[in-house]
A protein has these predicted regions:
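Short acidic (Asp/Glu) and glycine-rich catalytic loops that position anionic groups and cofactors
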Residues: 18, 47-51, 79-81, 95-98, ...
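A glycine-rich phosphate-binding loop feature that marks nucleotide/adenosyl-phosphate handling sites
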Residues: 206-214, 263-267, 284-292, 307-316
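Conserved polymerase palm-domain catalytic core
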Residues: 3-14, 18, 50-62, 66-213
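Extended C-terminal regions of large enzymes
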Residues: 294, 303-359
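Duplex nucleic acid-engaging cores and interfaces of nucleic-acid transaction enzymes
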Residues: 30-31, 35-38, 72
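A conserved non-catalytic segment of reverse transcriptases
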Residues: 121, 191-192, 196-263, 267-269
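Short, solvent-exposed helix-loop connector elements
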Residues: 132-136, 230, 246-260, 271-283, ...
Length: 359
């Protein structure tokens, strides 16, 4: 590995974000991805053990849930103010010279350093045109997360040196303190430290505020009537979930109810796997009922006319009077016969169809 290899340009791909902006990914070629992965397998065991224990993102044996649990513990200890820092376009603004300088302090192989530099300098292709890249380490390549941790670790160490309690996941960092005044001091410190790295804080998304109700990795903390600190799915994450379900259960396309459920299943189970850490059983029940409500509407549309609805409901064991009333009100079932339909198309009915549940 003498560092003479020249990587190909990465392909730009824009991923829409909930706020309407785009997250820019740089997708490397198959060959470059393999080389980056091999490089990662060599570097990660050497570098990862040097990182702060408060860093959780893209590290072996660490997950987002660990960062959320750490945040919960800090708040339980009485650190009720959070310094929530959002870095503006972090991966796009990484300074190459500063990053390479920090990497040299951990890796003394000249060939490796040259190869990493070559990947940083590789152009980015957009619409068939290759543009030179002077800064940034685009998301999409295997090396980018490790390099991000290399750059940000010195900020972690400064916070540790001052005795702060914090959790960082990639460029998302929350510091927990006991007072607003202490939080303002920490924010000023972080501005100085990030400025030295030529990184910018997104002031509109950063704040010194109450730790309760502040979104962190899709979760937020809340206090019960017994003063217990618990975890919940953030409101924005719930709304994003519902929006995705709306897309997956759109009533057009001619799909059977079984096909709709099959399309729904991977997303719901994946979402449940991530947010299963939340301590909000009532939210799960509410979202489950909301999903079943949409599925009932789809089922009625598939049955189309009143006679088919009547026949299908009878086949499911509904009393004739109930089936007749639902069929007669099929266009206004939500207002006139919602509870009757719920008594037929029950939770057990959707369980038999394989519909996943959150609760």
């Amino acid at each position: 590995m003498d560092g003479t290899y020249k990587p190909q340009s990465v392909r730009r791909v824009g991923i829409p974000k909930p706020d309407g902006s785009e997250r820019e990914l740089g997708i490397p070629t198959v060959t470059d991805r393999l080389i980056q992965q091999a490089l990662l397998q060599v570097l990660q065991p050497l570098i990862d053990p040097t990182f702060s224990e408060h860093s959780y993102g893209f590290r072996p044996g660490r997950r987002a849930r660990d960062a959320v649990l750490a945040a919960q513990q800090y708040v339980r200890e009485g650190r009720l103010i959070v310094v929530d820092v959002d870095l503006s376009r972090f991966f796009d603004r990484v300074n190459h010279d500063i990053l390479i300088d920090r990497l040299r302090k951990r890796v003394n192989d000249v060939g490796v350093i040259r190869l990493v530099r070559a990947y940083l300098n590789a152009g980015i292709m957009d619409g068939g045109v290759v543009a030179e890249r002077m800064e940034g380490t685009p998301q999409g390549g295997p090396l980018s997360p490790l390099l991000a941790n290399v750059l940000l670790d010195e900020v972690d160490r400064e916070l540790e040196r001052r005795g702060h309690r914090f959790a960082r996941y990639a460029d998302d960092c929350n510091v927990y303190v006991r007072s607003q005044k202490a939080g303002e001091r920490v924010m000023a410190l972080l501005r100085r430290r990030y400025d030295k790295l030529r990184l910018k804080i997104n002031e509109s998304k950063s704040a010194v505020t109450s730790a309760f109700g502040r979104k962190f990795l899709g979760f937020e903390l809340y206090k019960t009537g017994k003063d217990e600190v618990k975890r919940a799915v953030a409101r924005k994450a719930q709304e994003a979930f519902k929006q995705k379900i709306r897309q997956l259960t759109r009533r057009s396309g001619g799909r059977s109810i079984e096909q709709v459920i099959e399309d729904l299943r991977p997303y719901v189970l994946g979402w449940k796997g991530y947010f299963g850490l939340a301590q909000t059983p009532k939210v799960w029940l509410r979202l489950d009922e909301w999903m079943r409500h949409r599925m009932r509407a789809i089922q009625l549309k598939h049955w189309r006319c009143g006679t088919t609805i009547y026949r299908e409901l009878l086949a499911l064991g509904a009393p004739a009077a109930v089936a007749r009333q639902v069929a007669a009100n099929s266009r206004r079932w939500q207002r006139n016969s919602r509870y009757l339909l719920n008594s037929i198309l029950t939770i057990a009915y959707f369980d038999r169809l394989g519909m996943p549940r959150l609760s």
